[in-house]
Amino acid sequence: LLLDEPLSNIDQNFKEEIQTKLKKIIKDLKITTIIVTHDSYEAFYLADTCGILLDQKLKQFDTPYNVYHIPNSIEVVKFLNRGVLVPAKVTSPKSLENEELGTITGNFSKPFEIGSTVKLLLQPEDLHHDDKSNLKFDVVDKKFRGTNFIYSLKTDKNFILPVFVHSHHVHQHEINEKFGIKRPIHIEHLVCF
């Protein structure tokens, strides 16, 4: 079954209900289905496997989890538009150093030689808020998403870092306030290019 943008013109509230029903029908009837969509959340919800097609080439074909958390190219990162790439230097098999964020630990998605200069992908859920931290950046934007906020923080080097915070968090920050980042920084998947 081929579905080309089947839910693109449906009201958001109704769309989620239709997605749930569509997924159940596809699973219950065991229909092999290709769904073409520009909505990554829709693709991640409906698919067992996602393919990212850019410039008429298949850039990544993997589980929704891996496409989001372990994108295999800068092109896929830019297509998903969920994070920012910041410069860093690999300091050990499980850590790297960023001039503004300091040491960041985790598991590299692919190996790099110690001393390599890389671009580290930071996604909104990778950094954590901490009012007591001495690592602070200015809030330049704040998006309310119902269950969460996405804060945009500007660094001294003019990078804009997205940070996810649950909307029930006691202290909400406003534009131009300082926002603390929890240290030490640990990111499960260190995705670098």
Per-region residue spans from a language model:
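Glycine-centered flexibility sites
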Residues: 56, 62, 81-83, 88, ...
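A general secondary-structure boundary signal
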Residues: 6, 14, 38-46, 58, ...
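ABC ATPase nucleotide-binding domains
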Residues: 1-75
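Non-catalytic connector elements of ABC transporters
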Residues: 83, 94-193
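C-terminal boundary and immediately downstream tail of ABC-type ATPase nucleotide-binding domains
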Residues: 69-93, 121
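Residues located in well-ordered beta-strands
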Residues: 63, 75, 89, 136-138
